[in-house]
Regions:
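N-terminal targeting leaders characterized by basic, low-complexity, disordered sequences
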Residues: 1-6
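Solvent-exposed, non-transmembrane regions of membrane-associated and secreted proteins
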Residues: 9-16, 22-215
Length: 215
């Protein structure tokens, strides 16, 4: 009888350990595909996320001064016809390789990856900061591979010192992140480049990365 009790205890322990590892395995499987599941269940959340991304990111009564100091402005890089045509942003740390849309329609721009916020700077006209926005979680039609490649889902994994490259009209512009922040508004307008996305599905908090050009 005592042997059966000991056996039962060991059996219960093994069952508990089995359930523990099964739970860990399920979590590991679900995490990468959770955005896909969420947007399948709640397709309207994509609209809410888009609204938060394009919502005014400059706090009221803040005026952004143009960068007028010519001595610190870097030259436009040389034309390189071996580079891809069009406009792209690459973030090697998180393997992002996203097209940049210059569409006036933010909804259309965000569907294709990164959208450059209008009325701010561009690589060729950097008097104001370049502001690039993208979905964090994207659309239910996106595969996990596509989400990781063109969205800013993994932007929180980037930090100071990480590099960003913009390809713009067959010219290569390199930047380095110097500041990471979670906030409702942009707080540093001295940056050459600002990346941002939403933190959570319904959160007003955004994830910002501020970078300076290096080439």
């Amino acid at each position: 009888m005592e042997k059966q009790t000991i056996f039962q205890k060991f059996n219960n322990i093994y069952v508990a350990i089995g359930f523990f590892f099964l739970t860990i395995a399920l979590i590991a499987i679900i995490i990468p595909i959770w955005p896909y599941i969420w947007y399948r269940i709640n397709p309207k959340e994509t609209i809410k996320e888009t609204e938060k991304i394009i919502k005014e990111i400059v706090p009221p009564k803040v005026e952004i001064e143009e960068k007028k100091t010519e001595s610190v402005r870097l030259d436009i890089p040389p034309l390189n016809t071996s580079l891809p045509e069009g406009k792209f942003v690459k973030i090697p740390k998180i393997e992002v390789n996203s097209p940049i849309s210059t569409s006036k329609n933010s909804d259309e721009g965000l569907k294709n990856g990164t959208w450059i916020v209008k009325e701010y700077g561009t690589p060729e006209q950097p008097d104001l900061p370049i502001i690039l926005a993208a979905h964090r979680f994207g659309y239910s039609s996106w595969s996990t591979e596509k989400r990781n490649r063109i969205s800013y889902y993994n932007l929180p994994k980037t930090g100071e010192g990480d590099e960003i490259t913009i390809y713009w009209n067959q010219r290569e512009y390199k930047y380095k992140i110097y500041k990471s922040e979670e906030s409702t508004y942009i707080t540093d307008y001295s940056a050459d480049l600002i990346l941002y996305t939403c933190k959570f599905f319904n959160s007003p908090i955004r994830i910002f990365r501020y970078a300076q050009r290096t080439n």
